[in-house]
């Protein structure tokens, strides 16, 4: 699970504009993502919102590959 959490944190850091959009639109903030008591759940929910599956994160699949997939695969 920790690998999953760190992978999501790294992906969010790479996509700072996505994090900013989430902060404005859904009340997710940096404290919740990185230090909050439900950090893992919030990060998992954020990854799901971004269209990144747990399998892709754990496997280390390139995020651009995930986002460029045909939506019919999901």
Label each PLM-derived region with a short phrase.
Residues 1-21, 25:
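A short, Lys/Arg-rich alpha-helix, primarily the initiator
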Residues 19, 40-43:
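Helix-turn-helix DNA-binding elements, focusing on the entry/boundary residues of the two helices
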Residues 27-41:
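Recognition helix of helix-turn-helix/homeodomain-like DNA-binding domains
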Residues 10, 48, 56-74:
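Short, charged recognition helix plus adjacent turn
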């Amino acid at each position: 699970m920790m690998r999953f959490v760190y992978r999501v944190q790294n992906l969010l850091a790479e996509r700072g504009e996505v994090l900013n959009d989430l902060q404005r639109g859904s009340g997710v903030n940096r404290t919740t993502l990185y230090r909050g008591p439900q950090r893992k759940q919030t990060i998992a929910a954020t990854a799901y919102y971004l269209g990144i599956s747990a399998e892709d994160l754990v496997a280390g699949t390139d995020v651009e590959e995930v986002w460029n997939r045909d939506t019919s695969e999901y």
